[in-house]
Amino acid sequence: MTVVFDRPLAESPEGWSASLDLVARSRRGRTVLDGNRHHGPLRVQRPFYPEGGVCHVYILHPPGGLVAGDKLDIRVQCDSDAELLLTTPSAGRVYGSNQLRLQQSQQLSIRVEAGARCEWLPQESIVFDRAEAVNRLSVSLAEGADFTGWEITCLGRPASREFFDSGSLDQRWAIYLEDRPLLLETSKFVGGSAQLQAPWGLAGATVVGTLVTTCQETSPEQVREAIEVILSELRLSAQQAGREQTESKPFEVPLVAVSALPELMVIRVFGQRAVDIKAVFTGLWRILRLAQTGQDAVAPRIWFT
């Protein structure tokens, strides 16, 4: 099925529109890109195979960020038994919009067929002050398909004294198993609002992350135990670096919550440093992959360059 959101993204009189269509197929135990069509400044490098037949694909946006009116539309089809990992070579950026407050949008639509596994593991996105960011993810799964994906979003760059004082970020996730919704979620963050500091909101956290997985081989209890091990390591690193967690600095170590939904697990993280949230998510990804395949995951080498 095709997931359609309630309203299409508004057409912009300015900005660049770019699209990318990918089709991944399994051939003789190896996943290949059998379809690769792009329009505008959005494309992929050649596939990489650091772990046997799993296809690693880096999605490139040469301009390096979204400005007023830019629109990215990415569509991915994973045919039966394909194993596809999608990532990005560097942090994404959504810069301040113009006086017309034109949206800067990215829509990613993924279809995963029976027996296939798709992983969407991008590097973090930085939403700058005055941005009007829209980020939409729609995933359609066949019975017997697997999906793991995450998003890590930095609201401003406080370490550089660049705060998210105005603008907005509108995030929408829709994950379906055939015609049945597993997750429908809308989040909106408004720059400079009480939501960013209030206890009922982000409570001062400037980096937020969400990981979702259909992995049934790992229980929520195992995930929570793994998270505690990762957080213990982060606490030790923070202490060694002199970053003690205090009441005025509650997110020197991230806050993590796990929700076990029917056929889907959702992990949410609040923090102050993207690198810490990436440590949580990559650690969990390795555990999930080992449980699913019985083999250790090999991280994309672009993450270390």
State what each model feature region is.
Residues 22, 74-76, 110, 139, ...:
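Preference for bulky hydrophobic residues occupying beta-strand positions
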Residues 1-124, 129, 136, 286:
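N-terminal, charged/glycine-rich beta-strand/loop interface patches
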Residues 2-3, 9, 17-19, 23-39, ...:
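N-terminal intrinsically disordered, cationic/polar leader segments
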Residues 83-85, 117-119, 146-148, 209-210, ...:
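Structural motif
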Residues 22, 50, 54, 115, ...:
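A generic structural signal for ordered alpha-helices
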Residues 96, 153-305:
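A structural signal for small-residue-enriched, beta-sheet-centric alpha/beta enzyme cores
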Residues 78-80, 88-90, 112-114, 122-124, ...:
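Short, structured patches in soluble enzyme cores that scaffold and shape functional sites
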